[in-house]
Amino acid sequence: MFDWQQKQLQHITKAGANLPHALLLNGASGIGKHAFALGLSKALLCNKPTAQFLACGTCPSCTWFAESAHPDFRLIEPEDADSADDAPKKKTTKKRQISIAKIRQLVDYLSLSSHQVNARRVILISPAEVLNNASANALLKILEEPPENTLFLLVTSQMQRLIPTIISRCQKIDMPKPTRADALAWLQTQQVSNAENVLDYARGAPLLALQIAEEGDVIITMTKQLALGAKLDPFASAPIFLGVGMERAIDTLQKWIFDLITFQHAQVLCFNTAYGNAFQALSKSVNLNLLLTFQDKLINAKKTADHPLSNEVQLENILLQYTQLFKPI
């Protein structure tokens, strides 16, 4: 857990034995929601939690948890997951989702008694927005008749993708971004250089900023390609962008387009501050109406980033449309 999450932890711990059967942790990507959910799960299962409701780290329950072998805890995540929203997305073109098979396995697990007599069980589903229709409906049936002494923790950065009936079955906890000072202080502990610029690029999300810092060369290569405007080669550039995953690639494009729009209106750059000369040149040839339409297309593309259609084909098409923004009508 992180310092900026103490208020949410206190809110949950005040409920004590009266915790609801399901909590929905909602907030921006890269702010530590998954880490918070893991810490909360560990504390709830701990035999000797501290006065601050943190796991002791030494009891048998904590030992099981540290070994990813706790019999009363289940983590439900996509097949290709790597610590959900707080870790880099794997470089894959496979559809990223939580399958119905995983929920069926969960149903079988919940039919058994807890390992410890009358003990609580914790089910962590992260990120919940990648439940497909079948798995979402199967989970809904569980939430409608939840088993006793079982807490469901759902983590999401895109709550609008969840079916409304699942949301209504959960108590929503809004997870905050840290203050700028707290985020910078944490990044300094991670020895991130140029922390202020990286944090700005990550829109104030410190864990995402750390990831961007670690991917620095890839991000620089991507933005240099975008600076080419109409001269960008979509087919040569698409594999480079996919190196950070489809969702991150689209996010990079969105930030570039946002800066193009703000530069057109007010000569201001919010994310790509090192590319003033490039934006000066691009703004002279870009078509603003096409730019705004393309921005909407990127929003829709991000919603379907998990589509089974080849991500490379999708991205080639998006980059081709990008080059056409700079051509005369």
Predicted regions and their residues:
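Conserved adenine-binding aromatic site and its adjacent loop/helix in ATP-hydrolyzing domains
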Residues: 108, 141, 164, 168
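Structural recognition of the conserved hydrophobic beta-strand(s) that form the central parallel beta-sheet
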Residues: 122-126, 139, 150-156
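Conserved catalytic/switch belt of AAA+ P-loop NTPases
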Residues: 111, 137-151
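Charged, glycine-rich active-site and insertion segments that engage polyanionic ligands
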Residues: 1-43, 51, 60, 148-151, ...
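Residues immediately C-terminal
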Residues: 130-131, 145, 161
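Short, structurally constrained coil/turn elements
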Residues: 67-69, 146, 166
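Clamp-loader machinery-focused feature within the broader ASCE/P-loop NTPase space
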Residues: 1-134
